[in-house]
Amino acid sequence: MNDIERLEKEICLALEAASDEQTLETVRIAALGKKGCISEKLKALGKMDVEERHKVGPVLNGLKNRVLELWVQKRDLLRRQAMNKRLSRETVDVTLPVRSSPLERGRIHPISQVIEEIIAIYANMGFSLAEGPDIETDYYNFTALNFPEGHPAREMHDTFFFDVDKTGERKLLRTHTSPVQIRTMEKQKAPIRIIIPGKTYRMDSDATHSPMFHQVEGLVIDKTSTIAHMMWLHETFCKAFFEVPSVKMRFRPSFFPFTEPSMEVDIQCDRSGSKVKFGEGQDWLEILGCGMVHPYVLQNVGLDPDVYQGFAWGMGIDRIAMLKYGMPDLRAFFDADLRWLDHYGFRCFDMPAFFPGLRNE
């Protein structure tokens, strides 16, 4: 028994002294391999008498199990140490250097800025936000909005159509955010007061048009809304958005399939200088389209036009951003030019504040 105790101490010391897995494996083989010292003693059990074998056998098996357990613990420890060394050696600092000023950590795109401004203004007037899919069906984009068959907007030169799918349906990229009005009226009971900012798509590209552009539409549905309410709403929005105490607006007759009567709205401005100034001057600039929701549209969503009425409007976010902040070319919005963004972009503290003294100039 003394030999077994001495052997266990020697093996334990060898395991503790092992500094790498290769040395540790050598110790294991020397103890538990086919010709290892413990294995040889286990083989010798067959030559002992029964009484002695019953005494020595459990002791050797216990030794074998303890050595194996110590070996596993030591192996796991060496592996963790090796991994930590490797991680320390291969560490790459992916963080950016500290900027000189916390205000220079990035710029907010003008479109994002203007969308937040629009949402803040209308939210202050009791409107909620609505959203819908960019890929639409013909029904929601045209039919439900009173676009008759053969309407020019259905033609390929104006609308991005997808190939016909397995069901025989031909979907498209929405040409306006008006489909969200239909989806909202189908799901939500009146009264309804929503604004719908989002991306829209049309085949057009020049200095003031883009195949993908941003639009915001609004919808009011109840039993009492009139054109007078609509006119007040547009005037209030323009004063808040362009930050002027008063504006003059004119409403010109127009045509939209989904409104009747339909109007286009011009706002008074001064274009004599390099930047458009609102609330003064003798010029007029078209700013949005609007009108009372067409009775056929109300019928398409299950509303009785003899009971319910309302108005809708829409404007290009990119366009009013250009007008407010003096950007000459719409295409630069999507060029991903950091120099342009650094010049026209906004800091986080610029979003949005409509009260004197709160702007971070």
From Swiss-Prot:
It is an enzyme of class 6 (ligase). It catalyses: tRNA(Phe) + L-phenylalanine + ATP = L-phenylalanyl-tRNA(Phe) + AMP + diphosphate + H(+). One of its GO terms (cellular component) is cytoplasm. It comes from Bartonella quintana (strain Toulouse). GO terms for biological process: phenylalanyl-tRNA aminoacylation. This is Phenylalanine--tRNA ligase alpha subunit. Its cofactor is Mg(2+). The keyword Magnesium applies. The keyword Nucleotide-binding applies. Its EC number is 6.1.1.20. It comes from the Bacteria. Its main location: cytoplasm. It holds the Pfam family tRNA-synt_2d. The lineage of its organism: Bacteria, Pseudomonadati, Pseudomonadota, Alphaproteobacteria, Hyphomicrobiales. Mg(2+) binds at E260. Binds 2 magnesium ions per tetramer. It is found in: Cytoplasm. Keywords: Aminoacyl-tRNA synthetase, ATP-binding, Cytoplasm, Ligase, Magnesium, Metal-binding, Nucleotide-binding, Protein biosynthesis. Belongs to the class-II aminoacyl-tRNA synthetase family. Phe-tRNA synthetase alpha subunit type 1 subfamily. Tetramer of two alpha and two beta subunits. InterPro entries: aa-tRNA-synth_II (IPR006195), aa-tRNA-synth_II/BPL/LPL (IPR045864), Phe-tRNA-synth_IIc_asu (IPR004529), Phe-tRNA_ligase_II_N (IPR004188), Phe_tRNA_ligase_alpha1_bac (IPR022911), Phenylalanyl-tRNA_Synthase (IPR002319), tRNA-bd_arm (IPR010978). GO terms for molecular function: ATP binding; magnesium ion binding; phenylalanine-tRNA ligase activity; tRNA binding.
